[in-house]
Regions:
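Thiamine diphosphate
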Residues: 1-200
Length: 201
């Protein structure tokens, strides 16, 4: 079956995370990057799709980009690009989140700066409503969850500061029913890897 037609997806094989030892310092996004790559490699039957408006490398998803590559019409030599790439990058937040939401039979990840995420809210809410209606009709959705990862958080105050910060999406999703949307704030790499695996259920 084509990934776009598949609606009942078995839970993926989730590799054991590469745990960081207590007291070590590391980037939660780098840990998530490594774990997502291992998740994709452990599940070749699931078509991967990564939605990203901009700056996947700045978000420390280097291994994901190197493996899956930007989808482009004319790939440049020496750049992580391919005509069949699984990373959909466009300065259109609605388009990239919808690329992941439409991949019902696949393994998805959406990553964006926090300030760009509110533009994804409409599509995410419609997906939540559609899924809830399916459950109420006795035909619960059988696809995997779509993790949406926000970076440059309001409380982080790194190099991009306020221009990349806006907690609107997290606040809006906290108001949704917990049966359809979960909001997590992983404080470190270990919890980020667990949150990623848990979000697929």
């Amino acid at each position: 079956d084509h990934a776009l037609a598949t609606r009942q997806v078995a839970l993926p094989t989730v590799p054991e995370p590469t745990w960081a030892e207590p007291g070590t310092v590391g980037s939660p996004m780098s840990a998530l990057d490594t774990h997502f790559v291992r998740l994709v490699q452990a599940n070749p039957q699931l078509r991967p799709r990564v939605g990203n408006p901009d700056e996947l490398r700045s978000n420390k998803l280097d291994a994901t980009l190197d493996l899956l590559k930007h989808r482009v019409q004319v790939p440049e030599a020496g750049v992580a690009e391919s005509r069949t790439g699984a990373v959909i990058t466009a300065l259109n937040e609605e388009a990239v989140v919808c690329a992941a939401l439409a991949n019902k039979g696949g393994l998805n990840l959406v990553v964006t700066y926090e300030a760009f995420a509110p533009k994804m809210l409409g599509a995410l809410r419609q997906e939540l409503i559609f899924s809830r209606h399916l459950r109420e009709a006795g035909r619960p959705p059988g696809w995997l969850g779509v993790p949406v990862v926000l970076t440059s958080h309001t409380w982080e105050n790194a190099k991009n500061e306020q221009s990349h910060q806006d907690p609107t999406l997290a606040e809006a999703l906290l108001g949704e029913m917990a049966d359809g949307a979960r909001v997590c704030f992983p404080p470190d790499g270990n919890s980020a890897m667990v949150a990623l695996a848990h979000s697929l259920r």
